[in-house]
Amino acid sequence: SSEATVDLTVNPVNDAPTLDDLADASVAEDSSYTLELSGADIDGDALTFLASVDANGSVSVDGSTLTITPADDYNGDITVSVIASDGQASGSGSFTLTVTPVNDAPVIGTLDDQAIDEDTSLTVELSASDIDSNDLTYSATNGDSEIVVDGTTLTITPPANYNGSEVVTVTVTDGDLSDSTTFTLTVNPVNDAPTL
């Protein structure tokens, strides 16, 4: 028998990188979430990370730092997809970012300055918006006038024979947070009949 020597050359083949496991996470409404990404490449290639979100937010990647910014006032789940690439092949993964709700302050509607005659009352309809759809309660304060708030209806009755100007402060609250506005009430003088 005879022997022969054969040279066998094993050509390198690029192996796809792997992305380290991504755990679900949570963040408060109107806050950003940051995560350091990591992966491995058996060939020792440098990795580039890419990411995308399904909706209700934006995403950016700076090196291996992933930052997700939910849309303003959004709460709920965001699906985040991540890719680790060596320029030829890639590995991917995803996780769910849960955005937990945070109470937002109501916003009261502006009120125009008002004028009434002496010895009369003023009635004004109040309005406000609350993105959280909470129940809203109104209140008002000023000088010596009598103030009654019934639902969204404000009634102001100045003292008898009073004339002049006063600032009225109106506040709306959702039970936790509040917003206020002011307007000026001018009470015009009215001639009173003399008494004998």
State the predicted function of each range:
Residues 1-13, 23-104, 112-192:
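Acidic, turn/loop-rich segments in luminal/extracellular domains of secretory-pathway
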Residues 18-22, 108-110, 196:
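PAS/LOV and related PAS-like sensory modules
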